[in-house]
């Protein structure tokens, strides 16, 4: 929140409660619920945003194919939201898991941003399929 300056705003959305932070508007809700997205859009008003960060992950069931599908669905929702809300040069950071649907999602990212960078966090276990994709400079492709 310190990086956005006096005119910037930070919004945080989570299903779990979060302790208040200065200069952060927190919305408790599920990103998959239309009522939550409506509340977020109402808070944004007519403003476009510079950056969307999605660290969403579903509750893991242990059924790999189901867990992967849910992860990719959340990433797709976040990309759809980003394309609607980002300004013309906005950026999007999203956590995904490599597996079924990853290549298609990567293609959608490449259609939507001028450059896509992949990063595996050092904190992520070596055998984990977790990876972050950073879409730089939205260019308006339709995923």
Regions flagged by a language model, labelled:
Residues 4-6, 86-87:
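Helix-to-beta-strand junctions that scaffold the AdoMet/dcAdoMet cofactor pocket
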Residues 6-7, 13-61:
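S-adenosyl-L-methionine
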């Amino acid at each position: 929140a310190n990086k956005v300056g006096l005119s910037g705003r930070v919004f945080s959305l989570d299903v779990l409660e979060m302790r208040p932070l200065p200069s952060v508007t927190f919305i408790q809700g599920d990103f998959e619920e239309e009522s939550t997205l409506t509340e977020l859009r109402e808070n944004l008003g007519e403003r476009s945003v510079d950056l969307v960060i999605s660290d969403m992950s579903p509750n893991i069931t242990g059924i790999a194919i189901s867990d992967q599908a849910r992860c990719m669905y959340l990433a797709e929702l976040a990309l759809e939201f980003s394309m609607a809300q980002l300004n013309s040069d906005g950026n999007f950071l999203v956590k995904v898991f490599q597996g079924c649907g990853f290549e298609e999602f990567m293609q959608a990212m490449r259609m939507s941003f001028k450059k896509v960078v992949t990063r595996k966090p050092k904190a992520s276990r070596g055998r984990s399929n977790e990876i972050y994709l950073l879409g730089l400079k939205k260019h308006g492709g339709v995923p």
